[in-house]
């Protein structure tokens, strides 16, 4: 489970849950969820968007597996879509692509993540966390160029 910002950097990583658990189930077993439930995340106060006179809250964007909660957005059920909801789902999906793209960049940088890691769960967790931290470091290096580019 991970959360990324608009700069394609991880801001929260939780590694080690069995892949058979749903995203919603994984979330409830994270330190992030515990902090969220106990109001310890220090989510900024709502702010005005550019050219928009109304204050909007900061939110986390999830998929259908997540619960709809304050500061959490998820798509409308596909069974009850009208045009406005379809547009909303499309735009929410564009926001969700950030984390999907971050995982794509991560996997393309670190080939070890493209197949099952043949290490103990403890060591595999360390490898994944190290890859995520190195990814963030590389994202901050604006002049980083991969070999062959």
What are these regions (language model features)?
Residues 1-149:
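Short, well-ordered secondary-structure "scaffold" segments embedded in the functional core
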